[in-house]
């Protein structure tokens, strides 16, 4: 088996933000390679931790690493959009904290067979859950030009979405686009030479867009956070680590909405209880990685941690 190095980002900060109680019930919504899971377990005595991951490889790797799973830990091979259903199946209707570490893990990026990276020539795949049928190859070869433009613009914030989509549309009429390197060359061809020389790898934005579309990432996140806000107890917290602006804006917007005072007439001496928010932002601004972490973990550079706490039912 190939060994992949993975450094968990904001490991101590995200776990500390949960304020873990030894007898509490917690959820790690993104198991990955188990960094945050282990950190939470270190604080539990009689408590319980449910760790989710839609990637079978993550479940298998962590299971093998533990050998025998701690009695406090339950692993769930499901997307975190199934949060409520999965917890209900386990007899859990409320929890004391939930942690999300979003995006693609380093092992997923570094496994060339998964097709997540423009650095390796591999079949176009990008599925986090290998059980699903939609993959990157299907999107690139079958989705209409207009849909390609839409996802490149919306999910990749790519300025040359139309030009790239046109190149793809033209190429796939000649032969199917089946590998990451084929796609990289088409992306490069759709971006003017001057623009290719700035802003990092020219394929980065389109690969991100296709990955988000394949895995329906933003919709899954929004659905999961809505459930999480209902599941946590008073005093419970949700910690979310994001790595790109689309995720961060979604989390920021949702947290701001539920932690803000509802519309009330101006001039009221006291804001009525019905208008008071049920949640509070633990930090007004996101927590960022330390200089020390940035020096040893390049993946941490875009990370932001946002935390919210439930203060009323």
UniProtKB/Swiss-Prot annotation:
Highest classification ranks of the organism: Bacteria, Bacillati, Bacillota, Bacilli, Lactobacillales
GO CC, one annotated term: cytoplasm
Keyword flag Metal-binding: no
Entry keyword set: Cytoplasm, Methyltransferase, rRNA processing, S-adenosyl-L-methionine, Transferase
Ranges annotated as spanning the membrane: none
Catalytic activity: cytidine(1402) in 16S rRNA + S-adenosyl-L-methionine = N(4)-methylcytidine(1402) in 16S rRNA + S-adenosyl-L-homocysteine + H(+)
The enzyme's E.C. designation: 2.1.1.199
Signal sequence interval, chain numbering: none
Binding, S-adenosyl-L-methionine: 34-36, 53, 80, 101, 108
NCBIfam families: 16S rRNA (cytosine(1402)-N(4))-methyltransferase RsmH
Task performed by this protein: Specifically methylates the N4 position of cytidine in position 1402 (C1402) of 16S rRNA.
Organism: Lacticaseibacillus paracasei (strain ATCC 334 / BCRC 17002 / CCUG 31169 / CIP 107868 / KCTC 3260 / NRRL B-441)
Protein name: Ribosomal RNA small subunit methyltransferase H
Record-level GO BP terms: rRNA base methylation
Entry annotated with the keyword Glycoprotein: no
Pfam family name, one: Methyltransf_5
Family: Belongs to the methyltransferase superfamily. RsmH family.
MF term (GO), any: rRNA (cytosine-N4-)-methyltransferase activity
Classification via InterPro entries: RsmH, SAM-dep_MeTrfase_MraW_recog, SAM-dependent_MTases_sf
Subcellular location: Cytoplasm
Cysteine disulfide partners in this protein: none
